[in-house]
Amino acid sequence: MTKRLNNVSALRCLIVVLFINLIASQAVSAGERVFMWKVDSPKATAYILGTVHMMRKEIYPLDSRIEKAFKRSDAYALEFNIDDVTNIQMGTILSDVSYGGDDTIQKHISKETYDTLQKKFVEYGFPIEYMTKFRPWFLAVTIETLEYQKLGLDPRYGIDKYFLQQAEGKKSIIELESFDSQMDLFRTMTEKDQELFLVYTLNDLEDGRKNLDILMTAWSDGDSKIMEKVMFDPLKEDRQLSRIYEKLFYERNRNMTDKIIKMLAQKGTYFVAVGAGHLVGKQGIIELLSHKGYAVRQQ
């Protein structure tokens, strides 16, 4: 999603923001721990890195422990490879994010939500009429993207993208998810949940800015407890969000864990990069692997 919201750039920003988990970092410290875990099986080793999908150029190179783990790996696994999305798939994005015919967002959200949305886009310098054809979930993602771009974050410097560029032509690349599965997250979202997602996004912008420094420090210090608290405390305050958390986090965590376990059954060294929010908490990938009997050690 750029300020012009053309098809291709909109999709790219959409994908990075969906799975960014709203984390950012300005620098990587050489502290006691990094946001990476090592998992061993009789046949394989996997390094699992919590990533940030929008970053700043100056944070590279990353901590040497992360860089060395990537270099010694045989394969690179990420959520999904945006570079492999076909033109046909790109072309379908417009029908997924917008209403057809004379339909507009006013028919699908409350007047209160619409008025708040209108004020926000006036602030961005966009005429609201330009945005009325888009679905609530897409506008929520757009707003998140614009807010983080204002803070200097850029999807071109996302950590998963950084390693993908190094892996291409040199390592096997494994997708833990797919373009269609990620789009299905929103295709199957009810109108009620879409509006809830949009309202939460609009109401959380100020707290999101305040939490950015906390998340930045948690990521660079490898502090999974603080990361979990900031990312998942909103669920304690509003149980209506449980359906959205289940769809965007927990269900995906279970599926990606199954894929990682399959990798661990095959000989090799794997470098796995997923959004940092997928690793933390009782339903995060690290805990799920531990419950399956794997020894997981933070690096």
Question: What function would you assign to each model-found segment?
Answer:
Residues 2-15:
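Bacterial N-terminal signal peptides that target proteins for export
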Residues 36, 40-47, 52-244:
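Structured, acidic catalytic/metal-binding patches in enzyme active sites
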Residues 242-299:
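A cross-kingdom marker for long, charged
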Residues 32-34, 256:
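Alpha-helical scaffolding within the catalytic cores
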Residues 8, 69-72, 263-266:
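Alpha-helix C-cap/termination motif
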Residues 27-30:
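Boundary at the C-terminal end of the N-terminal hydrophobic targeting segment
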Residues 12-24:
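Bacterial N-terminal signal peptides
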